[in-house]
A protein has these predicted regions:
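Conserved N-proximal alpha/beta basic substrate-recognition cap immediately N-terminal to
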Residues: 2-95
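Short, solvent-exposed loop/turn segments at secondary-structure junctions
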Residues: 62, 110-111, 140-141, 156, ...
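Active-site ExK catalytic segment of metal-dependent nucleases
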Residues: 70-71, 106, 226-230
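ATP-grasp fold ATP-binding core
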Residues: 74, 97-114, 131-142, 161, ...
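Short secondary-structure junctions
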Residues: 78-80, 203-209
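Generic beta-strand structural signal
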Residues: 86, 151-152, 217
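Phosphate-binding site of ATP-dependent enzymes
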Residues: 116-204, 223
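C-terminal active-site "lid" helix and adjoining low-complexity regulatory extension at the edge
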Residues: 206-208, 217-263
Length: 263
């Protein structure tokens, strides 16, 4: 093995935000958490400009951190999604509120649905809201829920759904663990969901490493909402029930060490 070895890279000043997940994954991979790049790295926080050979490609991490980049890539590759547009300003965005159905103004660089809002003709935004603005059709459901599928080195796993308990008062339309939704593990994923997830991970550059996809059913088939992965801005939620929590680490373990053996 070359000098420098293998490690889970988690550097200052952002290491505190990823300490728990980095230590857990390091135990699963049987490698140390390191504060400087190793020869092979599973990267959580590293400052901009720090080069490291990373299991999850840096460009894929960048795509996963910005829903606008995903929207462009999904559209170009024909990944099935809800009707989505990037618009220059709020005046153009408000015109979507005049269309049939409801529309979402999605905050493009946050996780856990933070910042999302339903668009109206009276919508106001902070001056620092990132542009272009990301507009997406709101998929109406009798019971709000979002499905999820993970992928590691091209292998789909962990089919699940997030939904609110019946006793949750006034549930948020943004179905996320951060807004109080619970995970429920499911059985074999539908073929259409697997196909949509694989297409999304592939175009995002995550097919050979690790990522997850949020999905919704529609009359025309399964739709990909967004992809996520581990990186300096966020990490895939590990607060999931067993056996999924263990399976995430197992799947990453196998995919990571396969990458090490090939590079």
């Amino acid at each position: 093995m070359p000098p420098g070895g293998v490690g889970v890279l988690n550097m200052e000043p952002g290491a505190w935000a990823f300490a728990g997940v980095a230590e857990s994954l390091a135990r699963a991979l049987h490698v140390p958490v390191v504060d400087r790049p190793a020869h092979w790295n599973y990267c959580f926080y590293r400052p901009a400009g720090v080069d490291a050979d990373s299991f999850i490609p840096a460009e894929a991490v960048r795509v996963a951190s910005d829903k606008r980049l995903q929207a462009d890539l999904f559209a170009g590759a024909g990944v099935p999604t809800p009707d989505t547009s990037l618009v220059a300003d709020l005046a153009e965005a408000r015109r979507y509120a005049q269309r049939p159905g409801r529309w979402v103004l999605k905050y493009p660089v946050a996780c856990g649905a933070a910042g999302h809002r339903l668009l109206t003709e009276d919508t106001r935004l902070p001056k620092d809201w990132p542009k272009p603005l990301l507009i997406q059709a709101f998929v109406e459901m009798d019971r709000p829920e979002v499905y999820g599928l993970y992928g590691a080195a091209g292998r789909p796993f962990g089919w699940n759904v997030r939904r609110y308990r019946d006793d949750v008062p006034d549930p948020s339309p943004w179905v996320a663990h951060a807004t109080g939704a619970d995970y429920e593990l499911l059985g074999v994923p539908p073929a259409g969901a697997v196909e949509a997830a694989a297409a999304a991970l592939n175009v995002a550059g995550l097919n050979d490493s690790f990522g997850c996809v949020d999905l919704l059913p529609s009359p025309g088939g399964w739709l990909a909402l967004e992809v996520g992965t581990d990186g300096p801005d966020a990490h895939v939620d590990r607060a999931v029930p067993q056996p999924l929590a263990g399976e995430i680490n197992e799947q990453i373990h196998d995919a990571f060490w396969n990458w090490v053996s090939r590079t």
